[in-house]
From Swiss-Prot:
Keywords: Ribonucleoprotein, Ribosomal protein. One of its GO terms (biological process) is translation. Belongs to the bacterial ribosomal protein bL17 family. It comes from Metamycoplasma hominis (strain ATCC 23114 / DSM 25592 / NBRC 14850 / NCTC 10111 / PG21). SUPFAM superfamilies: Prokaryotic ribosomal protein L17 (SSF64263). Coiled coil: none annotated. It comes from the Bacteria. The gene is rplQ. GO terms for cellular component: cytosolic large ribosomal subunit. This is Large ribosomal subunit protein bL17.
């Protein structure tokens, strides 16, 4: 059996960066195509960010700002944090969890990796 610490051949700093980037892209674009493992890993963090957006307090804004990457959206006037609190979170006020959906796709041609689309419901 492989050494558990070397199972994915990546360090935790790399995983944290990838997860933050994918969650930010998911919240801004609405869906992301990635590997199945990455989709499963970012699902919980994306749902936590939407829950923080629903609370809409100063503390929740600071917690979300600590996690999300601050990149500009299409209209150039709002960053990802403002987009989460002003556009994404109000859509889910009546919903108690289950904000994302993972749909499996065919395996990737180059390395036969399991692919999936994670999208906001």
């Amino acid at each position: 059996m492989a050494n558990p610490k070397q199972l994915f051949r990546r360090n935790t700093e790399w995983w944290d960066h990838v997860e933050r980037s994918l969650v930010t892209d998911l919240l801004i674009n609405g869906k992301v195509t990635t590997t199945l493992e990455r989709a499963k890993r970012i699902r919980s963090n994306a749902e936590k960010m939407i829950t923080l957006g629903k609370k809409n307090t100063l503390a929740s804004r600071r917690q979300a700002a600590k996690y999300l990457r601050l990149i500009a959206t299409e209209n150039k006037n709002k960053n990802s944090l403002q987009y989460l609190f002003d556009v994404v979170a109000p859509k889910y006020v009546e919903r108690n969890g289950g904000y994302t959906r993972i749909t499996k796709l065919a395996n990737r041609a180059g390395d036969n990796a399991k692919m999936a689309i994670i999208e906001l419901v």
